[in-house]
């Protein structure tokens, strides 16, 4: 059985290079798709201080996945409640 590797996590652990990214706070999959092509290492979808709900997160994650680029998505949930984390995981 093969194990999935999180390349962003591995690169952060290695510490060999600076990693650059942006916060996505507009709730728009078109913006997420455009920024996926900008060459950032990571893109963080913010649910804490931005108007991103579960549907917005899912659509932005689909846009990032469809881009087939190395930008790794990260989601910041608005709290530590398990149901919030589960919703983000269910979104992708």
Regions found by a protein language model. Name each.
Residues 1-92:
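Expand to "…catalyze enediolate/carbanion chemistry for C-C bond making/breaking, isomerization
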């Amino acid at each position: 059985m093969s194990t999935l590797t999180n390349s962003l996590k591995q690169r952060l652990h290695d510490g060999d290079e600076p990693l650059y990214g942006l916060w996505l706070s507009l709730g728009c999959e078109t913006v997420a798709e455009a920024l996926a092509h900008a060459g950032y290492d990571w893109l963080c979808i913010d649910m804490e201080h931005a108007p991103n709900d579960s549907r917005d997160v899912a659509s932005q994650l689909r846009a990032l996945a469809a881009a087939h680029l190395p930008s790794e998505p990260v989601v910041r949930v608005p709290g530590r409640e398990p149901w919030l984390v589960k919703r983000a995981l269910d979104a992708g």
